[in-house]
């Protein structure tokens, strides 16, 4: 006599998603918490066999239940953005104007600002909560060494030889650690008119939902050839540098030391990062319509396909381009939302706050 009993538990999946958006004058916080619980099949089979000799055999096999839970703090696709700013010249003023209108990196999910030295109070002034204060930033204790001279051996740029400053910025960003919770890390030049929402849409096909998944990848954004000696068909231009979290993971875990063994002293920081990513085996993804850059291929600020436009070194020119790219209604809607968010904060904390004007200029 053979008796078989089989019990099968079916798969159960429960997903709960909560989205909360909070904006303040200094930061924009978008929180998405998605908890997914997957319970897989559990099967228990008992077989009993009885023979005429009265011998009996019982076999029991059990597959235990497995529960997998995945939680995201930030929305998909999330951006951690940063800028490195020189404390003299136009950049602090330009950054203050961006901060007021919550433009560029200040509209990313999280952001950081680094400077090449401590800034005086007058250079970083912005109105916030009714007080004149300075933008929070992290000073870097190294100096830019000057402009590159292409006539010298090993020099690859006639722009600032700023690699040492950015090496320190990357070290501080990794030490800060907040970028680990985001899908992409984005370095933005202060004079780039940058739209984070456009970049998020652009990156969706390249982004895995799970934070532990996804390829190590960076975006090359310029295909211009600079003379017969130029052998690089695709380049990383520094106005907008986009890296997946796992690309920076490769850099953070031994990659930085390997890359700093290259002969980089005559390089700009964008060329260094491209050579570094290639050395570490990070995948290139080409998007030559991502930026409109006068140093590569210029584009009209009305071009809706572009994620960023470069370069605009004064606030008037910067926000003229920003307004053209947003369109009159888009710009007014954005500024109205900024004013509403700051009024809501004022009501919560009882502070008087200077709000951005209705004009985008």
Give the predicted meaning of each segment:
Residues 156-163, 167-297, 336, 344:
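Conserved catalytic core of nucleotide-sugar-dependent glycosyltransferases
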Residues 71-94:
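N-proximal low-complexity "stem/linker" segments adjacent to membrane-targeting elements
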Residues 112-183:
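Active-site-proximal specificity loops/subdomain of glycosyltransferases
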Residues 1-72:
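Extracellular mucin-like PTS domains
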Residues 81-83, 113, 187:
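Structural beta-sheet core signal
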Residues 81-84, 135-142, 234-243:
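Conserved, well-structured core segments
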Residues 97-108:
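Short, acidic, metal-binding catalytic loop of nucleotide-sugar glycosyltransferases
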Residues 261-361:
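C-terminal catalytic/acceptor-binding lobe
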């Amino acid at each position: 006599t053979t008796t078989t009993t089989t019990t099968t538990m079916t798969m159960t999946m429960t997903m709960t998603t909560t989205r909360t958006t909070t904006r303040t004058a200094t930061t924009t916080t978008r929180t998405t918490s998605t908890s997914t619980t997957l319970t897989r099949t559990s099967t228990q089979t008992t077989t009993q066999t009885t023979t005429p000799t009265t011998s009996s055999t019982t076999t029991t096999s059990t597959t235990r239940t497995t529960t997998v839970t995945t939680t995201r703090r930030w929305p998909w696709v999330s951006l951690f953005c940063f800028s490195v700013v020189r404390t003299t010249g136009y950049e602090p003023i330009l950054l203050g104007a961006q901060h007021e209108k919550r433009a560029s990196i200040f509209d990313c999910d999280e952001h950081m600002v680094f400077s090449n030295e401590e800034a005086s109070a007058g250079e970083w002034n912005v109105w916030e909560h009714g007080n004149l204060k300075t933008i929070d930033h992290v000073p870097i204790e190294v100096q830019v060494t000057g402009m590159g001279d292409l006539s010298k051996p090993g020099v690859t740029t006639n722009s600032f030889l700023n690699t040492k400053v950015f090496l320190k910025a990357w070290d501080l960003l990794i030490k800060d650690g907040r970028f680990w919770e985001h899908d992409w890390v984005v370095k933005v030049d202060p004079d780039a008119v940058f739209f984070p929402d456009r970049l998020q849409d652009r990156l969706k096909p390249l982004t895995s939902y799970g934070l532990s998944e996804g390829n190590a990848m960076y975006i090359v954004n310029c295909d211009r050839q600079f003379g017969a000696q130029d052998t690089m068909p695709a380049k990383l231009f520094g106005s907008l540098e986009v890296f997946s979290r796992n690309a920076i993971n490769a850099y953070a875990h031994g990659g930085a030391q390997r890359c700093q063994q290259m002969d980089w002293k005559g390089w700009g920081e964008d060329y260094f990062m491209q050579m570094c990513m290639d050395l570490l085996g990070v995948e290139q993804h080409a998007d030559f319509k991502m930026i409109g850059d006068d140093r590569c291929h210029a584009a009209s600020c009305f071009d809706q396909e572009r994620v960023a436009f470069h370069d605009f070194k004064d606030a008037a020119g910067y926000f003229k381009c920003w307004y053209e790219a947003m369109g009159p209604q888009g710009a007014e809607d954005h500024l109205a939302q900024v004013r509403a968010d700051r009024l809501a904060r004022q009501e919560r904390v009882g502070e008087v706050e200077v709000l951005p004007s209705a004009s985008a200029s």
